Amino acid sequence: MDVSEVSGVPPWFADHLREEGIESLYPPQAAAVDAGVADGESLVASVPTASGKTLVAQLAMLSAIDRGGTALYIVPLRALASEKREEFAAFEEYGLSVGVTTGSYEDTGEWLADKDIIVATSEKVDSLVRNGAPWIDDLDCVVADEVHLVDDEHRGPTLEVTLAKLRRVNPNLQVVALSATVGNAGEMAEWLDAELVDSSWRPIELRKGVHYGQALHFGDGTQQELPVQRTEKPTEAVVRETLDEGGSTLVFVNSRRNAEGAAKRLAKTTVDGLDADERAALSSLAEEIRAVSDTETSDDLADCVEQGAAFHHAGCSSEHRSLVEDAFRDRLIKTICATPTLAAGVNTPARRVVVRDWRRYSGDAGGMQPLSVLEVHQMMGRAGRPGRDPYGEAVLLADSHDELDELLDRYVWADPEPVESKLAREPSMRTHLLATVASGFADSRSALLSFLDRTLYATQYRHGDGEDNLERVVDTTLSYLETNGFIDRDGDAIEATDLGHTVSRLYLDPMSAAEIIDGLADAASPTAMGLYQLVARTPDMYELYLRSGDREEYTMLAYEREAELLGELPSEFEEGRFEDWLSALKTARMLEDWASELDEDDIAERYGVGPGDIRGKVDTAEWLLGAAESLASEQDLADVSAIREARKRVEHGVGEELIDLAGVRGVGRKRARRLYDAGIETRADLRNADKSVVLAALRGREQTAENVLEAAGHQQPEMDGVTPDADVKESAAAAGTDDGQANLGDF
């Protein structure tokens, strides 16, 4: 189908596609048009990676906008939100406006009301619905990207319930669900009352196989010689041959440590294939990476990148990941070793994909478990870049002939599993039942069950034990919510209490709220450590794991600081509870170290974490402490100012005396300390400061000093003709604090 044949979209869209080099639609895209995606029909598109799902979404959104409507694009990851924002920004030259929102859960997003396309994570959309964002009622089209992730036990229920709420608010809403190839696409379409495009078509061939011995064994029975040299491992041999052919490789492993170890080893292979220009460009990129943060993770990543390899996992900062992804797309980095999160939608195609580890540790199973077919196929789908590669190859690695047969059966020849709803788990139900009642979607038990009838769970288990199980979980959850004061019940009728409304607005798990309220009940003046440990033990915080030898250290710390901890310390004989308490204490001490201005690299080394982990814990703690502040104020529980101070300290990573300074835009934790040591102790001091002193404290960086002074409200922030104060400069040099590197808290 020629792009000019598509009706219902703005006249300029066909010209735009031609400028992008697109003259005709892929078969799945044409099938979507035939199914009415540009005429307002709901659609489930279950097609492989790189088969044009985004264009299907654009057809739906632009046709809705052309009819005077608004479109919402839901993504599973913040990184994907940024990527989609950049893609859709191309439409701004045609008069459309695009907004992205992934931040505060208390924000109603009123500023988005005049946007044509809104990009948001499912959690953010859920919070906007809870908080009554007025533009939600006016949506005409919603696109749910990576909708197969409703199968994820942590994030899936939020997407599932959010789609049910959006369809309840607007019964005529067009829903376009973009999915990987799954085993029950028809059931997904039934849930959403949608047309179905279910296709295995790809723009270039994907050859799936297993490497064993000295050859690749493909699913069609053919073999390709790929010898492993005496000093090599199979992964290195695959990467080496791919480089020789001018291609790039994604290597998927099962842990962060394995990702880093594999990247360091493969860097010895990739470096031999670099030319002089690539070496120079990679050297510059490595310096950018080192400037992101002063941690061992940053240094290790930069060392790998200089040699043409990289690792990618959640412990890396978002800046690290973006730099690596961009350089890989530009074919500068030749190999990325990643954990499976990279397979979840971020656009990083490669000539070859190697699934090195097809098992990973499962705490629930108590050991190593095989990955699902769906997850492995998602990784494999990254192989082959349309327009760049003649084909894509996805390879698993076998150590024996028996394992070769097993991998062919389990992954190469297998169809992906059906997607299954995880809504009926009690942690999900706690949050979503309270939100459903508090936001007015149900005012009785029967109305709740009626609302839940619009979910995927109801579609899958409408008859038999599943329906009975849903009612049991609902009743258990309602009992918990009533016992803890979040709802009132009168017969069948249900109403959220003031506390319930607050908890829903704050986007807290009710169990987190109950833990915080209980901890603050007898805490007149809580310390920062006590507050950090309190929020760290809530279900909304993924606390740090206890490593070998940690139990003794943190048991001693628990008894030493027991007076500060909020709530009753469990007995050591309560094995599970005591371990959880110690894990929360370890997390709290990391937050305390951060708020005490310990260097980021020291924190990373002490706790065995990366900059991305630190940022994640800091952001979560800031949110939970903000929620604790609101709960304490509304419930008259504890000294709100103490909670506020602990929140601001963890937000900026500073001691109490630096909170005011660190709040100035562009200052951050290290610059605040330098200014303070130079005698500038408050925002008011900075507003009236001698510019030469500020310039010296900020290491002579004129633009930085000018920006900081302007943010503080200085009357004349310009640095023309200003020289650094010699006494301050000499003092700073003696202190030896000029590391010249950025830090999580610098900006």
From Swiss-Prot:
Residues 34-200 form the Helicase ATP-binding domain. Residues 711-747 are annotated as: Disordered. One of its GO terms (molecular function) is 3'-5' DNA helicase activity. InterPro entries: DEAD/DEAH_box_helicase_dom (IPR011545), Hel308-like_dom4 (IPR048772), Hel308_SKI2-like (IPR050474), Helicase_ATP-bd (IPR014001), Helicase_C-like (IPR001650), Helicase_Hel308 (IPR022965), P-loop_NTPase (IPR027417), WH_DNA-bd_sf (IPR036390). Its EC number is 5.6.2.4. The keyword DNA damage applies. Belongs to the helicase family. Hel308 subfamily. This is ATP-dependent DNA helicase Hel308. It comes from Natronomonas pharaonis (strain ATCC 35678 / DSM 2160 / CIP 103997 / JCM 8858 / NBRC 14720 / NCIMB 2260 / Gabara). The gene is hel308.
